[in-house]
């Protein structure tokens, strides 16, 4: 059974350069061998990530993320059974949230500063789908 999970978290050390590099490298290797696909967005010390794959694999990965010392305030925004993947082309795509077009952000947010903690899971999914459709994903992985 395929599932999709979207979660948000804060970086424990947001000023340490680009924490996504090590996360992306390990994600792509792990995800490929476990049939997990998705997108990782990072900016302003916040991670927003969509994961798709088998229920057991996604659940196990989420538990790793929730216990990862690089993350805090981990919150699941969306968890659903799916018929097909929306992010199947990426073992882990990447989006820099600080470089988003303001008009895209305002479409899904109350202000020009995107706060994934303040929006629903369905809004987060719509944002991620738009980023995919507008080629805002900078790393295909």
Features from the language model and the residues they span:
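Charge-rich, low-complexity N-terminal segments
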Residues: 1-141
